[in-house]
Amino acid sequence: MFKNKIKHYQQTVLIFGLILFSDGLSGQEQKKAYVDPYLAPIDTSIVFNIIYPPLTEREGKSLDIPFPPNEHPRLFFRAKDIPALKEKKTNPHMPDCWKRIVDNAALQTDGKLQQDGKKHNMNNKIIDAIEARAFMYAFQKNLKAGKEAFEALQNYNKTLLIDYEKADVCRDIGRVILTNAIVYDWCFDLISNLQKKELICQMENLGKQLEIKWPKLAQGSIVGHGTEAQLARDMLSCGVAVYDEKPEIYNLAAGRIFAEFLPARKFFYAASYHHQGSSYGSYRFQWDLWITMIYDKMGYPEIFGKDQGKVPYRWIYSRRPDGQFFRDGDDFNELYIPFGKTWTITGAAVSGSYFNDPVVMNEAIAENQIGHNGLFDFLFVDPLVPVKTGSSPLTRYFPAPLGLMAARTGWGNEISSNTVVAEMKIGVYNFANHQHLDAGNFQIYYKGPLAVNSGIYQGKTGGYGSDHFVNYYQRSIACNTMLIRDPDEKFNWHGRELANDGGQQFPNGASEPVNMLELLSKDYKTGQVLSHASGPDSVKPEYSYLKGELVEAYSDKVNSFRRSFVFLNLDNPDVPAALIVFDRVNSTNKNFKKTWLLHCIEEPNITENVTTVARLGKGYHGKLVNTTLFPVAGNLVIQKIGGAGNEYSVNGKNFPQYTFNENNSADGAIWRLEVSPKDAANIDLFLNVMQVMDADENNKSLVVEKIETEKYAGVKISDRIILFSKDGEISNQSISLKISGDKTYKVVITDVQHGNWKVEGLKDTVCQVRDGQNLLSFSAPEGNYKIIRSLMK
């Protein structure tokens, strides 16, 4: 148990333009009002008399918070770590890191920044040089380097210019705070008391100009810029460095982290993911790793728990053979990474090292991550962690608050690979910000992206908040889910009225949840996983099954929307896999049009109830064939929407967007398939069977046969039979099944109650169904069978 030794320094007084600290406080001084430094003009040369407010529950009041050790250095490493670091310096995997540190320290600079005509003169090369010199002193007692580091930092601070209109300028401001904290801690005994106070002033004055408006902590703890470096790395580092001289900084930063960051991370890390997706997810995950490393080096390991180490698996499983990830939320990777270059998992090297995970470490090495950030890679990365490739199970379930299943047929990493990758998402919580309205979404890749998300995050018509962004890109209409259109429904984003796409509502009007209390008490819950299973082999499963209820993602226009996915590894070189999607949608008004969506890059071809989607060019050569079994032929409308001038259409109005440059890896999906029933009804069933293959004219798709009984609907494809309950409920009733054909079929029946089920007609065949899986499977030749729930234990 951590002992709380937080020191309370309630007052600072301004003397000779510098902040001095008072250890003894009178009762009257303790009652001084909080002074808001942000109300003053923004000027780094002005020193403010900051009176810190009393800690509240949001800042960890009454929590047992760990405190920094009484020694220097203590930020990122301690004296006891130096022998191991010296051994690491000689490791054959570390020469790039050490060389970069040495080269940075040797940079010819006195720290002074150019000011001629500049509004913003941040210089990361000088930052790196200052930190490298400070490290040379703390690590090797190089006195000359230490003195040069401090002198250069003083010059840097005096000549720094900040353009407060620069986008995301808080990231630059925070980086300077970090450098000040590092020099303060690593060169502590070279700095006089007066100079220490100057550095503290500088860090506080910079801190008040962050978006979190230090010490207000104006932003949230779950999502948004407030969860990035500002608090997690920059102000926390400042607090650790100056704890003995001004503990209020640490108390405030650490208090918010332990009160709000920690429970939120434990909540979503349980699902082995970060909710901000394929770009912002790993970007923000790295800041949580900084918190982990700061505390670990102070002697407090794994403050977020071991689940943090599993987060990179979300991106490992969503990686396509072309080196990219399935798109998840706002994605900037596809806009700025050239086609053909492997996308990286930010933080994989640190996470793989810290949690001793060979699979994650292999990702980092394959992505050539180690050595680019010489100093921090040297401090945080363990080159002795082994690597492992291609041994993970092909299916992985990511539980609530995500509720997603990723299924693969292999781990191929070439664009010509035969590996199929699919994602099936229920989506239990929507955290807003960069997350999309995509509950129920699916994506498929085989020799090219075949079923994908649509839209462009940033482009010539704008970025976050543009018309394209709020009316199309973040909306359900841009995903492979279901639309239920109430013509009178209103949609808004932060109070801004939007086009009616018929999809899901922005939770809480798109406002970001500040903390767990808001997340759990407001309407951020979008779904519930009802069942999930894969098997029979756990490493190479033949089937992967996921089912959920999605009514919470929609307005009251929907009574129920249950979606079931079954991914089949067919082990067939011509048609390697299939994805079956079964939907039961119950709307409150029979006239609300229901539309099943599939987005693709090239124009689809529709022949009766069969749609073909190909992906050619750029080295791709894949094809998807979708057979629609429900709605039935007489009640079926299939149409394609898209093409030039109609790429991102909502109810006939296009919301255009264009990438900034041609050298990108954007999928560029400008077509979609819409499947709807012709007749109005409250309850509609949808059953779509997608199979993938090479895009050769001679390559024929498998025969797809519909199966329907009074209670079940399903499909026979290849040697597989898959059945779903038509009413969407779990059943304990007996099932009659007639199998015809000249082969042995692998049967999967979903929506069955847990317990033992006997297959009459197959000698001694009893299937055990586990609670939460609600699926039974067996193999059987042609014949008549009755499956009965047994009372035997």
Model-derived features: positions:
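Aromatic-lined, polymer-binding surfaces characteristic
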Residues: R74-I82, M94-R319, Q324
